[in-house]
């Protein structure tokens, strides 16, 4: 790939914020020094001792936008408004870029929380209503709503690393472009100011009684809301469309603190690693940075850690570096914070200005000396800017921007992405934590009867639950007390994958190994504790510890802390595709970036009481103990729910022997493919082309259909389109017939496929339904050396992964 093809530029932007709706109003407020922090919130604040927040002005929005409707959560409605502006300003229409070549990568910390709260606070006996709002609450469903509204039919990724979400999203969006999976990516983030988030930060004592004053007094944050989106394109494509780039995205970096669930590492080491990674990725030195846009929440912990990180990266030059935070204007917009502040930075750079730190009056004595104090932007022309974001769970992200797109061409080219291998794998499911291959070959379903005594609503007759896992015995030094179920599953799976790889995490290697996780929903244990505290004591006295655990990346952050994984981190809220999304994204990060030597990738899913009740509502007669349910059946469905986790250790092939000298790779990542919900065949085609093989070279296919007619048909239609008549000669496997159909099934499917590569044999489908033209019994024509893993979902899109024996 040429230098110009790799260069990533920004061709459109859109903003919805408390200071203004649309770029013009947004910048006018910044230029005039107006804050969006005010007292007009959409909920009563009499029970609190703080009454301020940066809420959207209803008069500036389309009528009824924040009310939502039966199909769309209010957060999605706000995101659509910002994303539409970005696309319009980029000149993107169906006539300029094909819908299936448009991708979306959206970040959110609490997307869908309005709907999840409605679910939690609705009488359990209102089963139909609860099902509707639970289905609408998925984070990936918000991304789907934006994509559907704007005609985006390419890959869809949802990133949820709390307040770093939209900054992480930019990095994943760039990787999609570099691998040719899209011609343009709409990327950004959204979050709304609802009482749950306001009350949560209030319970933590984090909110200032006056408008936020980063690095100044009073100490504390102001909660905000909004959405921001960018259009990313390759420079060549933008020029071909005669679009003038607004800026260039030069470098991205991320890291994990491994310190605390909510507080940043006070030494600034974690933030510094992300900053250095972004600078290295950009090929820019600290001395070339002319402006730093800080996360700058206004809390003592964040502001001090960020300043110490700057001192570590910039040395003595940190004293002279212009620094500002936009939180005084916008409040803390959570998952939208990074992208809205990037938009403000680009708008300022275009005008030869730097945005100020609104509200700064008095230094706390330990912060950047040059905080661009005052209300009016400063005149200054800078070539490069650096942006930082930090979050609950210890997640950090950073990006380097250039005001002139010509600077993007100076990046050192990777002529061919690095080869990636898998060093270790694990699975935690109804079979336990070992013996997956044997359990799948026995062919006996692992679900058992569900005890419905005491439940106010019907529960399904059977489910495939994970048996007790001795985490403290399996992972030395890890205390499972205080961990919720999802965290225990993910931590166990990640630890077992590292052990299978023979990888010992210690010394400087801790900073070079990271975690990319997938998840379908908030952790049920912690969510129950959070809303139970609201029901028992009211919003103003809710549980602060439970609030800190209802961010989607809480389990990933806890696993990273427990296992000392301090390298790049991300959380893909991909619903049923979370596992495959995590593996595909991790493979792209290793292939295209240089800030990690290895990544643990995988996903976890749990069967909370609410999921069991919802499944019983949708499939009241599904499953009997020891009786398999039909997968890929043509005319009936009776799926059984399961749960579990699976993780994999990915590394560059060139460094695998140095990382794990006693273990050989167990698989090679030959190709990945991502596409929209109607494009599973397209995703498979991407993977085949990346692997440089034909359909005839595939020895086995592992599907992730959950037993519903729709999911089965989506996989079968795509397979017939790609393989044609030859499909009858290729065994099709699916572990749901033994382990149950969990929302994290695509990760468990990948683990099963790796076992097929280890043994050379595909697995049978228990009680295989009669499907003419398909080889469902697992018999192979010969040793399984190449396996295709697939998954598709109407909201999350489609994914394909090709693995080969090493």
Annotate the PLM regions.
Residues 184-188, 598-604:
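Short, well-structured beta-strand segments enriched in hydrophobic/aromatic residues
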Residues 169:
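Active-site histidine-anchored catalytic micro-motif
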Residues 1-155, 175, 194, 200-222, ...:
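Conserved "HGTGT" condensation-loop signature of ketosynthase/thiolase-family condensing enzymes
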Residues 173-193, 590:
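Short glycine/serine-rich loop segments
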Residues 155-161, 568-573:
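Short loop-beta-helix segment that forms the pyridoxal 5′-phosphate
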Residues 163, 572-576, 595:
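Glycine-rich, Trp-frequent "lid" loop and neighboring beta-strands that shape
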């Amino acid at each position: 790939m040429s230098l110009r093809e790799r260069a990533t530029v920004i061709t459109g932007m859109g903003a919805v914020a408390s200071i203004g709706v649309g770029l013009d109003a947004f910048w006018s407020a910044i230029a005039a020094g107006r804050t969006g922090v005010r007292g007009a919130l959409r909920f009563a604040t009499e029970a609190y001792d703080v009454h301020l927040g940066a809420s959207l002005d209803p008069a500036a929005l389309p009528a009824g936008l924040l009310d939502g409707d039966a199909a769309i959560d209010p957060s999605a409605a706000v995101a659509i408004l910002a994303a539409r502006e970005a696309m319009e300003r980029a000149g993107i229409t169906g006539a300029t870029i094909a819908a299936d070549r448009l991708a979306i990568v959206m970040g959110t910390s609490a997307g869908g929380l309005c709907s999840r709260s409605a679910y939690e606070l609705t009488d359990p006996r209102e089963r139909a209503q609860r099902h509707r709002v639970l289905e609408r609450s998925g984070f990936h469903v918000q991304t789907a709503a934006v994509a559907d509204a704007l005609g985006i039919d390419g890959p869809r990724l949802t990133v949820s690393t709390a307040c770093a979400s939209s900054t992480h999203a930019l990095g994943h969006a760039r990787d999609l472009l570099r691998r040719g999976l899209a011609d343009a990516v709409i990327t950004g983030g959204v979050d709304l100011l609802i009482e749950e988030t306001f009350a949560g930060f209030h319970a933590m004592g984090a909110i200032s009684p006056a408008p936020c004053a980063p690095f100044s007094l009073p100490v504390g944050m102001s909660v905000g809301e909004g959405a921001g989106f960018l259009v990313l394109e390759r420079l060549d494509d933008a020029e071909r469309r005669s679009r003038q780039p607004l800026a260039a995205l030069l470098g991205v970096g991320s890291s994990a603190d491994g310190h605390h669930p909510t507080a940043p590492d006070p030494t600034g080491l974690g933030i510094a690693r992300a900053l250095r990674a972004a600078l290295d990725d950009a090929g820019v030195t600290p001395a070339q940075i002319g402006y730093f846009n800080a996360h700058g929440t206004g809390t003592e912990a964040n502001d001090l850690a960020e300043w110490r990180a700057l001192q570590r990266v910039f040395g003595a030059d940190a004293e002279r570096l212009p620094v500002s935070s936009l939180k005084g204007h916008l409040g803390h917009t959570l998952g939208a914070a990074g992208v809205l502040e990037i938009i403000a930075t680009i708008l300022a750079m275009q005008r030869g200005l730097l945005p100020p730190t609104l509200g700064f009056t008095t230094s706390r004595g330990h912060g950047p000396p040059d905080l661009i104090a005052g209300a009016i932007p400063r005149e200054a022309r800078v070539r490069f800017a650096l942006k930082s974001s930090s979050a609950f769970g210890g997640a950090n992200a950073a990006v380097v921007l250039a005001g002139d797109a010509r600077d993007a061409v100076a990046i050192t080219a990777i002529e061919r992405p690095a080869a990636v291998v898998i060093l270790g794998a694990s699975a935690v499911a109804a079979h336990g934590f070992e013996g997956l291959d044997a359990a799948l070959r026995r062919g006996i379903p692992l679900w058992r009867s569900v005890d419905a005594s005491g439940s106010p609503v019907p529960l399904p007759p059977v489910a495939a639950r994970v048996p007790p896992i001795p985490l403290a015995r399996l992972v030395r030094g890890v205390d499972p007390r205080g961990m919720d179920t999802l965290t225990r599953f993910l931590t166990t799976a990640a630890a077992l994958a590292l052990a299978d790889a023979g990888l010992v995490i210690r010394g400087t290697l801790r900073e070079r190994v990271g975690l990319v996780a997938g998840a379908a929903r908030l952790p049920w244990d912690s969510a129950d504790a959070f809303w139970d505290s609201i029901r028992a004591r009211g919003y103003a006295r809710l549980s602060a510890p439970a609030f800190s655990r209802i961010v989607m990346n809480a389990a990933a952050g806890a696993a990273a802390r427990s296992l000392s994984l301090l390298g790049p981190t991300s959380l893909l809220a991909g619903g049923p595709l979370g596992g495959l999304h995590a593996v595909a994204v991790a493979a792209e990060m290793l292939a295209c970036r240089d800030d990690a030597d290895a990544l643990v990738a995988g996903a976890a899913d749990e069967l909370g009481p609410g999921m069991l009740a919802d499944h019983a509502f949708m499939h009241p007669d599904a499953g009997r103990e020891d009786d398999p349910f039909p997968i890929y059946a043509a005319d009936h469905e009776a799926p059984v729910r399961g749960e579990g986790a699976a993780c994999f250790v990915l590394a560059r092939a060139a460094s695998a022997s140095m990382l794990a000298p006693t273990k050989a790779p167990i698989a090679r990542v030959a190709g990945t493919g991502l596409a929209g919900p109607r494009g599973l065949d397209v995703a498979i085609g991407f993977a085949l082309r990346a692997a440089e093989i034909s359909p005839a070279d595939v020895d086995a296919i592992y599907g992730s259909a959950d037993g519903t007619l729709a999911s089965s048909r989506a996989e079968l239609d795509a397979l017939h389109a790609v393989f044609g008549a030859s499909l009858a000669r290729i065994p099709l496997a699916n572990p749901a017939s033994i382990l149950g159909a969990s929302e994290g099934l695509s990760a468990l499917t990948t683990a099963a496929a790796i076992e097929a590569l280890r043994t050379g044999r595909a697995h049978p489908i228990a009680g295989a339904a009669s499907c003419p033209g398909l080889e469902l019994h697992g018999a192979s024509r010969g040793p399984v050396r190449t396996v295709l893993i697939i998954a598709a979902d109407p909201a999350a899109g489609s994914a394909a992964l090709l693995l080969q024996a090493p």
